[in-house]
Amino acid sequence: MIKLNQIVKRYHTKDKDVLAVDHVDLNIESGSIFGVIGFSGAGKSTLIRMFNNLESPTSGEIIIDGDNISQLSKSQLRKKRQKVSMIFQHFNLLWSRSVLKNVTFPLEIAGVPSGLAKQKALELIELVGLKGRESAYPSELSGGQKQRVGIARALANDPDVLLCDEATSALDPQTTDEILDLLLKVREQQNLTIVLITHEMHVIRRICDEVAVMENGKVIEQGAVSKVFENPQHEVTKRFVKDDLNDDFEDSLEYLEPLDHDAYIVRLNFTGENTTEPIISYMTTTHNIDVNILEADIKNTKNGSFGFLVIHIPHISEEHFKQFKHNLHEQHVNVEVLKHG
């Protein structure tokens, strides 16, 4: 279990004080994958660097498995960092060392005998899919391969927690998915708790159990990923979800021809089993209305599916529309009016 209690981080500059992290509270369950998302400057990188005391909080407590990180002595902190490991956006590999030597490096620092260190490193290199590349140097590797080395190195001391600081931001979409799949694999095999920060909602949706959304140093929204996608509350969260769904229809509403007085354009939002229900068939048969499909998409999270459907209803009375909306609501389909004639 990881607990953050009222974490504050201030930077003092010549001209002013900067509040980078503003009274953040988080509870992260052991064995879960917890994501923190925010735009640049939101405070997420500063926050994650306080988990292993690369940055010290100005005030507040970070407790990992019962240890208050800020109160550990230097020797205790060094030992704790072996159990709270980290991977980085730009890999931070040692360019003069081979893949094998990069992975053995933290074991050398920990005083592990060279034979055991080599054996452990070879096992980890195979785990991350780089068997046969032990003698290669970082300059000979692709971005995805470099991050695989970073993951293997981070696992060398059998950590309980893996911190991921924008670990996929420098990668192309396909390689990103491969690294995310690898993180899921090592989480299961190593029984890890993973905390990752990102500005990509796709990353959150694909592997996280819970998410916290940050803006201006504050956590503005938090919850299970499926619930946050289903019903985002804050405008920043709505923007992330909208971008992930490629839902840009509202931006084009003003360019549509004027609607008839009894016409509607609505968005239907649905989750879980509703994503496979014949909603269009229900509308046409039960309510005897014509619909035009303008836009649609479905996405999957670890805990279920969610999606939306934008439709144009050319003719429907106000009373009929109220009944239609009520009936869909009973089926757990949210109806949002985007435009009305």
From Swiss-Prot:
GO terms for cellular component: plasma membrane. Its EC number is 7.4.2.11. Gene3D superfamilies: 3.30.70.260, P-loop containing nucleotide triphosphate hydrolases. Residues 2-241 form the ABC transporter domain. ATP binds at residues 38-45. It is found in: Cell membrane. PANTHER family: AMINO ACID IMPORT ATP-BINDING PROTEIN (PTHR43166), METHIONINE IMPORT ATP-BINDING PROTEIN METN 2 (PTHR43166:SF36). The complex is composed of two ATP-binding proteins (MetN), two transmembrane proteins (MetI) and a solute-binding protein (MetQ). Part of the ABC transporter complex MetNIQ involved in methionine import. Responsible for energy coupling to the transport system. This is Methionine import ATP-binding protein MetN 2. The gene is metN2.
